[in-house]
């Protein structure tokens, strides 16, 4: 349903943000 789609979208967005943040913190961008 719509809620599941939103949950998946939020998970993907959070994962991308976490990857970018960890990459900047480790200086490996």
Curated annotation (Swiss-Prot):
Pfam families: Antimicrobial_2
Role, per record: Antimicrobial peptide.
Primary localization: secreted
Residue spans crossing the bilayer: none
Protein name from the UniProt record: Brevinin-2Ra
Native organism: Pelophylax ridibundus (Marsh frog)
Tissue specificity annotation: Expressed by the skin glands.
Family the UniProt entry places it in: Belongs to the frog skin active peptide (FSAP) family. Brevinin subfamily.
Protein's cellular compartments: Secreted
Cysteines paired by S-S bonds: 23-29
Keywords: Amphibian defense peptide, Antibiotic, Antimicrobial, Disulfide bond, Secreted
GO CC field: extracellular region
UniProt cross-references to InterPro entries, sorted A to Z: Antimicrobial_frog_2
């Amino acid at each position: 349903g719509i809620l599941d789609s939103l949950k998946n979208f939020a998970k993907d967005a959070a994962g991308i943000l976490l990857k970018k943040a960890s990459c900047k913190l480790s200086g490996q961008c």
